[in-house]
Regions:
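Gly/Pro-enriched, hydrophobic low-complexity segments
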Residues: 101-190
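Short, surface-exposed beta-strand/loop "edge" segments at domain boundaries and coil↔beta transitions
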Residues: 11-15, 34-40, 55-62, 114-117, ...
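Solvent-exposed coil/turn segments that connect beta secondary-structure elements
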Residues: 8, 23, 32-34, 44-46, ...
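Well-ordered beta-strand positions enriched in small/hydrophobic/aromatic, beta-favoring residues
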Residues: 3, 27, 90, 106, ...
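A short, sequence-level motif marking secondary-structure junctions
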Residues: 21-26, 42-46, 64-70, 150-153, ...
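Generic structural motif
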Residues: 3-5, 90-91, 147, 184
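N-terminal mature ectodomain segment of secretory-pathway/periplasmic proteins
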Residues: 1-54
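Flexible, processing/modification-adjacent segments and terminal tails
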Residues: 44-118, 138-139
């Protein structure tokens, strides 16, 4: 499948068009605006490997750069790679409701000192198994990022993302310091 959409900065209104494809367990995010860039997540490796393709070639995005913003938005490479989904020893923290839906709250802790997050709490829909929202914490257990699925769509019986809100949080006072939306159009089958 192929989906088009955009990342949009809430403060400036600036948007970055994107194309998202998934084929052979490789997810590709294509950004056409200058400088053009492709970020692809190869889920054939364990853990999944994040690559960046720019003029001059392709390279693995090093762990030390996972906290860098993608296209100047509040969405970073760690968010894009969803690397925290592969962290070992998830812990069930309880249950909650998100948009009226029952969810489990699952906490994962970063097994290394690399990356922007120390721990991540995920609200997982009990019905679909999909993530409804996420809160990420720094090494002092202060919230630094949260995102929430604000719209979903059905594709051949499966629930897929339509809109995601990503917020960066000031760990000192909990205030939102930046907000980006990822919006995706209806998927189209690859030829």
């Amino acid at each position: 499948y192929k989906m088009t959409g955009e990342l949009r900065d809430d403060t400036s209104g600036r948007s970055e068009p994107l194309t998202l494809t998934m084929q052979n367990r490789v997810m590709r995010f294509l950004f056409k605006n200058a400088p053009p860039e492709i970020v692809h997540l190869d889920m054939n490796t364990s853990p999944a490997t994040l690559y960046q393709v720019r003029a001059g070639g392709s390279s693995v995005v090093p762990d030390s750069q996972h906290g860098n913003k993608v296209r100047g938005m509040e969405f970073n490479y760690e968010d894009l790679s969803l690397a925290f989904l592969y962290w070992p020893r998830p812990q069930l923290m309880g249950e909650d409701r998100v948009s009226g839906q029952k969810c489990w709250i699952v906490r994962v802790t970063n097994p290394s000192s690399q990356g922007p997050y120390y721990a991540v709490d995920l609200w997982v829909h009990q019905g679909s198994g999909g993530a409804a929202k996420m809160a990420a914490f720094d090494r002092t257990s202060k919230i630094v990022k949260r995102y929430q699925v604000t719209k979903v769509q059905k594709v051949e019986g499966a629930t897929t993302l339509k809109e995601l809100r990503i917020e960066s949080i000031n760990p000192a006072n909990g205030a939102v310091i930046g907000r980006t939306y990822m919006k995706l159009d209806d998927p189209v089958k690859n030829n």
